[in-house]
Amino acid sequence: MAVSWLRRLAAHAPAAVFLAEGARAGPVRETLAVAHGIQLVDSPRHASILLIVGNVSNGWHDDLRRVYDQLPAPFASVWCRSEPFEALSNPTRIDDIAALPQGLIDTQRELMLGQRASALRLLPDEPPNPWEGLGDDGHGGEGMMGGNPYGRPMAMNMQDDLRDGLTLDTLTFRLGPFHPALPPGLQAEISLQGDLVQSWSVTRPPFASVIDPVFLAARQAPVSIAALELTRARHHLHRLYRGLCIAGWPTLAERTLHFAGKLGPDSDIAGLRRSLERSGLWRLALPAPGRGEVDKAQARELGGPAARAAGIEEDLRCQDANYRRLGFVPTCQQAGDTAARWWQWLNEIEQSLSLARQAIRLDLKTAESAFIETPHGPWDSSCPHDKSDLLSDLLPGLEWGEAMLTLASLDVAGLDPHPLEDTRLTSTFQAGREVGT
């Protein structure tokens, strides 16, 4: 069968990949975002490949099947460090992160050229709720009393408005656990009135974040302060990258990610900071001052950068003699709102780079191993724990965009103290995606 010119054209397009992150996935999103020939998309309906990375236990399989069946044909699934569904015949599995980009590119090319058959659907072709022949008019609705018209729940104005007294219909839905704007694993039941978050209830907490190996090593023996601080700065840059993606600033997001990939003790964040300030991000995209604010008790529970953004000068590095030799003093904001937490990332990145340069010059290692200040918060007698229960208090009353950017500024996942091997790619697949830093 002849291959049409349209198929040949599609075969050479970047591989459109929707990433479903399971437990212990690691920074695969950041890795693939700079890989040449890969395009990460925000919806499974825009993808030709579903990439599942990390452990997805049985309790999440139904959610993953729903994502799987949303991809338009022809499509395929690729499993990385994850067990494929038993119902799949000859699933593609790639556990080597370095081989993942080329494997995705080859899969897309085979699909588009007709060399690989499209994957089969896993779920029956049925509406989410039965509706045919139900209700007064046979479409599932119950007049003005709700029901499920054509299988979809009808919005109802059953709750008072939180903002201006205008009672709009309330739409309740469930989001997660594989939505790219949420921490991996987080699932919530949300009620919206217009674009206002009326309620937010966490139904499943996020998967625990995986600790970088250098922080685990620091709990066992003295390690280079420069290595710790460069890793801390890179972590904050990755958080900033994800936040910029959610805010809809892809060019600055990609620039931030490339800066993180090239990060070294001589790196200077001044140019990136200047671009962020001049772009109008704080004025045009981030919530207004006071929005997403945490009180002192919430800030202490969150710990780490979120606490320091609320004016709490708590940082375990202050208790390390060699950090004190470097003149370390916590950098803090005072407002404790969403914008303050974004500023805190930038200030801590700049501080970490300065500490790394000084530590290299003095050849300093950590003096304490009984505790460590991780990028997620303090790790002393226990790891940072899950704090997603705070979201039910913090997010209601915010507009949808404000809520997503507030959530992006909060590190609510617990910490998994067992590190992964390095998941960053070599330069082979980063070629062709360079931008100015």
Regions found by a protein language model. Name each.
Residues 1-35:
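N-terminal, charge-rich interaction modules
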Residues 18-23, 48-49, 52-56, 76, 80-82:
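Structural motif
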Residues 97-437:
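Metal/cofactor-centered catalytic core regions of large enzymes
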